[in-house]
């Protein structure tokens, strides 16, 4: 496995670790509605950071974006909006299925759809079947899905042991939402594929290869922001017990603390895709669709490890922790199989 591929896998791991931790600051926000908190954090992660970093990287911000026609920008934006719909469905999936089953089904589906649909859409799926490297990466995807399934099982054992149940368990509704979440969340993978002309244009302007994907986030995350912020604003306007005015009528020190914590959560959320861009740039172009598989499987891996560090599994017993550890090992093996496939 060459150095570039190793570093690509490493950067995806760092990005996934940030994704697994990003909600920790949000949990410390007090006396705010989820909608206000999510809007503040989202404004930082989907609007302020992508625009600011792009303005720093590009020699002429407006000239860069106006150089593309609608046929280039619209698919990127719409796939970003598609991914934003997946974000909203993610929370509803957890509500109706519980954390473990919801994450397992949603992540498993988005891992498969986001990874394999890209080469199919590009007309390159035969490369996966007819080459040794392609077959190795397919095997890696299969092993990763198995690893996600094992971690999901560990979570179910933990929830059963600790008496944790879904907020409003509904198997049929939860499964429909989980499938929708998995499919729509793959929009980020499709958006990155559609944004290749933007990456190439950034490279032509002298942007470092590690950073060429970052300007496209202005459009991708703009689509996600439209859906997420629109959802939050509609709820804040229509739901009687939600009020932005009430949220910002608290004591000033608490408001400042809540804003800073939400902004920190937004920063950590953005960093997952900052390092995703680094990992994506380090992987051979013919296998760039594997970025999504690495990101999502590492997200599950890091989520389990963060849970252990935060002692969320202390009262779960030895068996769930053992199953979790096995699942993490399987995901690590999957990443190595994919790495070897890309290097062959």
From Swiss-Prot:
Pfam families: RhaT. GO terms for cellular component: plasma membrane. InterPro entries: L-rhamnose-proton_sym_RhaT (IPR004673). It is found in: Cell inner membrane. The keyword Transmembrane helix applies. One of its GO terms (molecular function) is symporter activity. The chain crosses the membrane at residues 4-24, 38-58, 72-92, 101-121, 137-157, 175-195, 214-234, 259-279, 290-310, 321-341. It comes from the Bacteria. It is a multi-pass membrane protein. Keywords: Cell inner membrane, Cell membrane, Membrane, Sugar transport, Symport, Transmembrane, Transmembrane helix, Transport. It catalyses: L-rhamnopyranose(in) + H(+)(in) = L-rhamnopyranose(out) + H(+)(out). NCBIfam families: PRK13499.1-1, PRK13499.1-3, RhaT. Belongs to the L-rhamnose transporter (TC 2.A.7.6) family. HAMAP family: RhaT. Uptake of L-rhamnose across the cytoplasmic membrane with the concomitant transport of protons into the cell (symport system). This is L-rhamnose-proton symporter. The lineage of its organism: Bacteria, Pseudomonadati, Pseudomonadota, Gammaproteobacteria, Enterobacterales.
């Amino acid at each position: 496995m060459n150095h570039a591929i190793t570093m690509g896998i490493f950067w995806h791991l760092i990005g996934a670790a940030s994704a697994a931790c990003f909600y920790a600051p949000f949990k410390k926000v007090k006396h705010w509605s989820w909608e206000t908190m999510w809007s503040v954090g989202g404004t930082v992660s989907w609007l302020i950071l992508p625009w600011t970093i792009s303005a720093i990287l590009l020699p002429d911000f407006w000239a860069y974006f106006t150089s593309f026609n609608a046929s280039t920008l619209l698919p990127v934006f719409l796939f970003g909006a598609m991914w934003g719909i997946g974000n909203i469905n993610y929370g509803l999936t957890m509500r109706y299925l519980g954390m473990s089953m919801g994450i397992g089904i949603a992540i498993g589906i988005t891992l498969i759809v986001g990874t394999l649909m890209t080469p199919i859409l590009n007309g390159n799926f035969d490369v996966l079947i007819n080459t040794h490297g392609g077959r190795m990466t397919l095997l890696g995807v299969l092993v990763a899905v198995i690893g996600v399934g094992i971690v999901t099982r560990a979570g179910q054992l933990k929830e059963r042991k600790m008496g944790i149940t879904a907020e409003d368990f509904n198997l049929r509704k939860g499964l429909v939402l989980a499938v929708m979440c998995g499919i729509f969340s793959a929009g980020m993978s499709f958006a990155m594929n559609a944004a290749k002309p933007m990456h190439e244009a950034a490279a032509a302007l002298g942007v470092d290869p590690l950073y060429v994907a970052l300007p496209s986030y202005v459009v991708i995350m703009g689509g996600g922001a439209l859906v997420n912020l629109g959802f939050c604003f509609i709820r804040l306007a229509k739901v009687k017990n939600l009020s932005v005015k009430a949220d910002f009528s608290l004591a000033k020190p608490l408001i400042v603390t809540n804003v800073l914590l939400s902004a920190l959560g937004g920063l950590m959320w953005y960093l997952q895709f900052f390092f995703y861009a680094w990992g994506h740039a380090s992987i051979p172009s013919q296998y760039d669709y594997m970025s999504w598989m690495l990101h999502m499987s590492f997200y599950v891996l890091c989520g389990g490890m963060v849970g252990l560090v935060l002692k969320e599994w202390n009262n779960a017993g030895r068996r769930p922790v053992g199953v979790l550890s096995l699942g993490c090992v399987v995901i690590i093996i999957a990443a190595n199989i994919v790495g070897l496939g890309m290097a062959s």
